[in-house]
Amino acid sequence: MPPVLPKYLAGVINTPWKGVVILQVVIQKIPENLQEFEILAVKGRQPEHICALLLCALSLFDKNMTDGVNAMNLLRGPKPMTPYDAQFLRDRLRGKAYLPLAYFEGATPENGYQPRVPYRLNVLADPRPQDMEPGYLLVFLKTAGADSPRPMKLRQKASTGEWFLWEYSSILSGIRIPAAEDPWA
């Protein structure tokens, strides 16, 4: 039996994986600054693009906190970052510049989480979308650094139909450290 697709996926070409729909986003370059991020962000507000943009914003945050906060605010919409949110990101990313890249295809602990270029992100749709309240969407991101895909929740702004970040703390949870940094490897 084919998986039940969220309404926004109707008509989208996708690839099934173990009964779960996978949407792939391809990025040629990870933004180096806010201006590059904004150009990339114009390409779409679809949920799978928001997932890829989150990883780009986290990478940017690690390089330049101000640009990273501004990028995150673009993704969070009407719920901007608080100082607590910025501190949470700083704590989770400290010493882990590899973390945002770990979700792209080809990134493994063995290669220091250096993904192949172009950057490909596979977004797994919720296998049980009927359990999600209207206006919200649960998706999952897979990394070679964890045993199971990590969830993130998006929220749709009813007046515009745009999707925004809502809950993404699992994406920032610890993963296996790169093999080069692992004294037990």
Region roles according to the model:
Residues 12, 16-105:
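Core segments of small alpha/beta cavity-forming domains
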Residues 142, 147-184:
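Short beta-strand edge/turn micro-motifs at domain boundaries
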Residues 86-147:
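Surface-exposed, charged secondary-structure patches
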Residues 2-3:
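Intrinsically disordered, low-complexity, charge-dense segments enriched in Lys/Arg
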